[in-house]
Structures are given as C-alpha cells and as structure tokens.
Amino acid sequence: MSPQGPGTAVDVDDEVVLLDPDRRPCGTAPRLAVHGLDTPLHLAFSSYLFDAAGRLLVTRRALGKRTWPGVWTNSCCGHPRPGEDIALAVERRVDQELRLALTDLHCALPDFAYRATAADGLVENEVCPVYVARAVGDPDPDPAEVVEWRWVDWESYRQAALAAPWALSPWSVDQMTAFGQAAHPLTAALRAVG
C-alpha cells in the first residue's frame, strides 16, 4: 500500500492533461490551478469499486475539498498524469485515497464526459472514462479526501441518483444515467472480456 499517512496531502503539484475540443492532448496545467470559474477541458477518470458481495463503495468527499465538499459520490476520481496510462492512474489514486488494492479493473464508459458548475461557481469540465473494479478489503481513507464511506447495493444507488440527484455529485448522477438500466457494471465488464 501507499506510504502516505492519514491526512497526508497527495498529488498537490500534479499536472493534468489539457484537451482540445476534439479530445486530443494539447498541453498540461497544474491540477490546483486548472479548476476555477472557467475550467479548461481536461482528462480525468472515475471509478466504481465493488466488494466480493457485489456492493458498491460510495464515498463522501471531505469537507475541505475545493469542489463539491461533503457530497456523496462514486468510489474514487482523479486525473492521470501526463503520459500515465489511465488504468494505472486509477490504481495509483485508489491506493492513495482509499488504501485499497484492485482486481478485475475494466473501463466501462470510455467516452464519458461532463461539465458541471458548483454553487460557488467552480467548474468541472472533464473527459472522464469510467472504470469498474473489485476492491480487496475495506477502505482506510485519507481523511483529507474522504470523510465517510459505505458499501451499498448497486440498484439502491442507481435509484438514489434518479430520485435525489441533488444529494450526489453531478458526475456520479450523469454516470448512473450513462450506465442506464444495464446489468451490474462489474458483471457486465467481466462478461465482455470473459
């Protein structure tokens, strides 16, 4: 696992990959500087992690987070570093944020993108492939990143996104819509490669 200790800031000086309107890399920018009132399109990822029973790990963003503090969301999100394989970035970020190892990592929504504006005007503007994986064990989250976590039933979370979208992160709500009525996403991904 990561050498990071609880409460340790991670990736503070990371660069994110900027994208042109055709979603091609066109430069880099510091992660902390890129998110603002006029956030440029950039590359990110989201992940949905499941336990051995098929339950989804949902997390509540720490209250000190710059964007959407205290909001419930999918398992983990982040940004690949310039030149970094996105699947490896998912594994790196999950280890840093949740101190979890993964198996059966698959990209479920390779073309997902969204733009959302928070109540304070901060904008997310991301091409954000969505990954699913099986988590090994329970998380031990970095409190600077995650204030709470729960294992929940997939269908219950999908229904919550439909019934109370204001209670979840906007990207997670949009991703649940993109998953649609399909079967459990990890099962579907494993079946597709199997």
UniProtKB/Swiss-Prot annotation:
Mn(2+) binds at residues 35, 42, 79, 124, 126. Mg(2+) binds at residue 97. Binds 1 Mg(2+) ion per subunit. The magnesium ion binds only when substrate is bound. Residues 40-174 form the Nudix hydrolase domain. Pathway: Isoprenoid biosynthesis; dimethylallyl diphosphate biosynthesis; dimethylallyl diphosphate from isopentenyl diphosphate: step 1/1. It is an enzyme of class 5 (isomerase). GO terms for biological process: dimethylallyl diphosphate biosynthetic process; isoprenoid biosynthetic process. It is found in: Cytoplasm. It catalyses: isopentenyl diphosphate = dimethylallyl diphosphate. Pfam families: NUDIX (PF00293). Its cofactor is Mg(2+); Mn(2+). One of its GO terms (cellular component) is cytoplasm. Belongs to the IPP isomerase type 1 family. This is Isopentenyl-diphosphate Delta-isomerase. The gene is idi.
